[in-house]
Amino acid sequence: SVAKHIPGHGCATDDSHKKLPIVNDNIKKLYFKDFLPFKNINSHFVMTAHILYKKIDPKFVATQSNVIIKNIIRKKLKFNGLIISDDISMKALSKNLVYNSKLALKAGCNLVLHCNGNINETTQLLKSLNKIDDFTKKKTHQLYEFLR
């Protein structure tokens, strides 16, 4: 099973399918209200939240935030499994699919989901990501090692 939406969705009041939820709470409140249920979770997989936590990373949503994925999910919550993005075509993300996907992978997501069923978007995304660079090889190797 996949635990979602890490690092937490409780303080968000908007639906990320429709628009970007913005949370202005400080990290201490978020830790005890949203993040704590994910600490030492017994799951090999988690799905990220498309939420902007302004007091943690004012520039990037959790899915695309190196600060949140590395410092909170990996270090503070001690999650060592596979991190999967939520659907990269959701309205919470305002940029194009390629940009959103690359940013999520660069931030630390191991897999990026594209789930809206639009085959033209999927084709565009796959064509633009088809060049296997060193970064993609590293991510693929991490996934392979995890699944072994």
Predicted regions and their residues:
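Second-shell residues forming the walls of enzyme active-site clefts
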Residues: 2-136, 146
